[in-house]
Amino acid sequence: MSARSDVTYVYDGSFEGLLTAVFESFESRELPCSIVAEDEFAPTLFACKTVDTDPQKADRVRRGLKNVSADVWNAVRLGYLTCVEDRGTLINDFVHMVMHYGAGVMRMLADDTVSRLTKAVRALKQESHKYTGFVRFSISEDNTLTSIIEPKNSVLPLLAPHFCDRYPNESFLIYDKTHSQALVWHNRQKMIIPLDGFEQPQAGDEELYFRALWKHFYDTVAIEARYNPRCRMNFMPKRYWNQLPEMDESNSPDAVRGVKRIGA
């Protein structure tokens, strides 16, 4: 492997930009001390190198990794979506190991680089799986479904196949508040777009009615004698609760008791 240098690579934050930075590392025959996105970069006393995204260079890295093995490519592709510390540097170090050891690098779990990346990807998959059950949609007046989530990792690309297949004829938006981006599904077209400061439309009477019904159902099916908050937090950690209507006491069934449902 190349020698570690004191240079920091700064890229535009995109996956193509990261792959370009990896290419530059190989071309320069150096392992930069850090590879960071420009929005995460902090001034340093050491030399910095701005890497301009080059689709052709990125594609060469992509094709090279795919030629090694699908597992290697998926580790890099999914690693980019994780919240692991110093993600760009970790992925670059991993790619250098891949070029040295080949596909067998995936079995080198005792190595710190491989271990950290593997654990980060596993955490990403686990979090995205949880969100397939924890996403709660609200319906707006134009019949668009909206939801807000606050994940640690960038889970929207992994959630897209599940929800697009589940609601093929609906229009919906899932807003990732942590990473300021949204998954949009409309007219059977999928997009993941940057989005800052999204606020859900004010809930109408119909929406409030069903929130209260769901809260009432959640409270009713609970078995008081088996109440175990620690067990519940193991399966449904508290950080997911902010966007769950069943955990919001304002959705009390008393608020709609005696209210006639619209259209009923």
Language-model regions, residue ranges each:
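Charged, alpha-helical interface segments at or near domain boundaries
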Residues: 36-129
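Long, compositionally biased intrinsically disordered terminal regions
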Residues: 171, 182-188, 199-264
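Acidic, Ser/Thr-rich peripheral helices and adjacent loops at domain boundaries
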Residues: 52-60, 189-203
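Internal, well-folded beta-alpha domain core
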Residues: 104-195
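Short coil/turn segments at secondary-structure boundaries
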Residues: 75-79, 177, 226-233
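Short, hydrophobic/amphipathic alpha-helical patches that form generic packing surfaces
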Residues: 17-28, 93-100, 158-165, 211-219
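N-terminal ordered "arm"
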Residues: 2-55
